[in-house]
């Protein structure tokens, strides 16, 4: 018995029309009422890919910064509360998160950082979350992630996104407000909530309270560790006695061990550490239980489903109420498509157009036969038309081959862009032709410790495969010659001193963000 396969039309579009984003930007008078943003209006406008006037964006960001600046470096929050992990510019999934977790008007929220970069709707996430903070300053809380800084937002996508959608002034305002974000939260006097993890320089909660957070995070030290550190890959079954080892995946900070966490929890009378920072296939992970309490010593929560549109992971939020902890998972939502690195469709289509135009020119020049090109003039001298036309054909033919390479490699270029942290191709790749592109692709795959059997042309089908290819993006990017300055003019060193407690180790950490 034959199985009938569904028939698809080859002459009609599956989706016949796409709504055009609103062209008019919302004004200050429209967005604000009694000094607070109108959340329903803003949400509906942003979901349609609408934008606001620059003065509206600046007011939301600066008003949010004023509230965040008044909060302590380690805030104290009470249950019931919903704890959320990385968002990474996935605005349409953030809307799904609030559907799953509950309306912010009657639900308490704690976000653990990484609101921007990698996704293409980061500024929408900032504007919406900061508007919620203005409306609910005592029930919605925001912590800093490792991506809320100048160094990473310049290296990845957020700075470019701000320039394209708004201006560099909006980006600078975001950097100022990121400097105001708290670094940790003490939940119900039971849980320490941070973005990354622990630090050998932090042995008690008071060490966190004393930290100066109002600056660009340095490349090392306790602030860096709170934002960047990870649990060991073999957390809970370590083969080393070291509490902290150098984080070879990040290129900065540390891996921390199960004994280090248990010791910290015991010394500070805590149940567990709740953190984000690493993608999880199920959206969360409960680590080995603390033998003294029977409760998981460490919990990772991740709230960006189908991360980068290739991970195929679920997202999750953690709801804590009446001493009961529940995990709610959710899948990704449809979202508008952006070409990599915010490329416009004209730039993307140039190789295709160029190939066809050069083909047409070659065909026009080839109309002349050999006999026509050998015609002599009245004085009997052979014209130079034959050589001139042949030279033109050769030149245009060479150009045609370049466009053909570009056209054939368009999809591969997209793939290579996705595997490079800056979203740009290595210098000289295109001028070297197809073979150079193939070589660059293979080098990219090797550099990222791609899993065995992976080829660039084939589609990424699993969480582990995506994580292996994206490993290079887990590292702290190389720093520029100039150090970053914060508002008071202090400078931070861009070198990383040797870790006194770091042993030589090649553990590979999990996917991180």
From Swiss-Prot:
Residues 472-513 are annotated as: Disordered. CDD domains: MPP_PP2B. Residues 400-407 are annotated as: Autoinhibitory segment. Residues 458-480 are annotated as: Autoinhibitory domain. Residues 344-366 are annotated as: Calcineurin B binding. Zn(2+) binds at residues 114, 146, 195, 277. Activated by Ca(2+)-bound calmodulin following an increase in intracellular Ca(2+). At low Ca(2+) concentrations, the catalytic subunit (also known as calcineurin A) is inactive and is bound to the regulatory subunit (also known as calcineurin B) in which only two high-affinity binding sites are occupied by Ca(2+). It is found in: Mitochondrion. One of its GO terms (cellular component) is mitochondrion. Its main location: mitochondrion. Forms a complex composed of a calmodulin-dependent catalytic subunit (also known as calcineurin A) and a regulatory Ca(2+)-binding subunit (also known as calcineurin B). There are three catalytic subunits, each encoded by a separate gene (PPP3CA, PPP3CB, and PPP3CC) and two regulatory subunits which are also encoded by separate genes (PPP3R1 and PPP3R2). In response to an increase in Ca(2+) intracellular levels, forms a complex composed of PPP3CC/calcineurin A, calcineurin B and calmodulin. Belongs to the PPP phosphatase family. PP-2B subfamily. This is Serine/threonine-protein phosphatase 2B catalytic subunit gamma isoform.
């Amino acid at each position: 018995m034959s199985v009938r396969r569904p028939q698809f039309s080859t002459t009609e579009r599956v989706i016949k029309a796409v709504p055009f984003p609103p062209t008019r930007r919302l004004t200050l008078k429209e967005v604000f009422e009694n000094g607070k943003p109108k959340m329903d209006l803003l949400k509906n406008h942003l979901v349609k890919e609408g934008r606001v006037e620059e003065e509206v964006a600046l007011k939301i960001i600066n008003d949010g910064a004023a509230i965040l600046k008044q909060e302590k470096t380690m805030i104290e929050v009470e249950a019931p509360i919903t704890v959320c992990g990385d968002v990474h510019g996935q605005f349409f999934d953030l809307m799904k998160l609030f559907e799953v977790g509950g309306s912010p008007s009657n639900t308490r929220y704690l976000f653990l950082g990484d609101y921007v970069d990698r996704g293409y709707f980061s500024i929408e996430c900032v504007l919406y979350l900061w508007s919620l903070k203005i409306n609910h300053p005592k029930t919605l809380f925001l912590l800093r992630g490792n991506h809320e800084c100048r160094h990473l937002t310049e290296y990845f996508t957020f700075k470019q996104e701000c320039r394209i959608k708004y201006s560099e002034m909006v980006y600078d305002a975001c950097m100022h407000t990121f400097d105001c974000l708290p670094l940790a939260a003490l939940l119900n006097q039971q849980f320490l909530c941070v973005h990354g993890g622990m630090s050998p320089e932090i042995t008690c909660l008071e060490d966190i309270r004393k930290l100066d957070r109002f600056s660009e995070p340095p490349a090392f030290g306790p602030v860096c560790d709170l934002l960047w550190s990870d649990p060991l890959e073999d957390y809970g079954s370590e083969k080393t006695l070291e509490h902290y080892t150098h984080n070879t995946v990040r290129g900065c900070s540390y891996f921390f061990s199960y004994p280090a966490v248990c010791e910290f929890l015991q010394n500070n009378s805590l149940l567990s550490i709740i953190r984000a920072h690493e993608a999880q296939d199920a959206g969360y992970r409960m680590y080995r239980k603390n033998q003294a309490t029977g409760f998981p010593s460490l919990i990772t929560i991740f709230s960006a489903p189908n991360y980068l549109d290739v991970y195929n992971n679920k997202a999750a939020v953690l709801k804590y109420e009446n001493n009961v902890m529940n995990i709610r998972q959710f899948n990704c939502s449809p979202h508008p498509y952006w070409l990599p690195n915010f490329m416009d469709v004209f730039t993307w289509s140039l190789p295709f157009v160029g190939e066809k135009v050069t083909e047409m020119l070659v065909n026009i020049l080839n109309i002349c036969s050999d006999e026509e090109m050998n015609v002599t003039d009245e004085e009997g001298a052979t014209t130079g038309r034959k050589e001139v036309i042949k030279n033109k054909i050769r030149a245009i033919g060479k150009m045609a081959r370049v466009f053909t390479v570009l056209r054939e490699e368009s999809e591969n270029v997209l793939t290579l862009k996705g595997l490079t942290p800056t979203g740009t191709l290595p210098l000289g790749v295109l001028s070297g032709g197809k073979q150079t592109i193939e070589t660059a692709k293979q080098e990219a795959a090797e550099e990222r410790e791609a899993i065995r059997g992976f080829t660039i042309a084939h589609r990424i089908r699993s969480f582990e495969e995506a994580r292996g290819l994206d490993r290079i993006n887990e590292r702290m990017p190389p720093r520029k010659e100039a150090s970053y300055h914060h508002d008071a003019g202090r400078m931070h060193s861009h070198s990383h001193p040797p870790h006194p407690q770091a042993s030589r180790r090649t553990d590979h950490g999990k996917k991180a963000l």
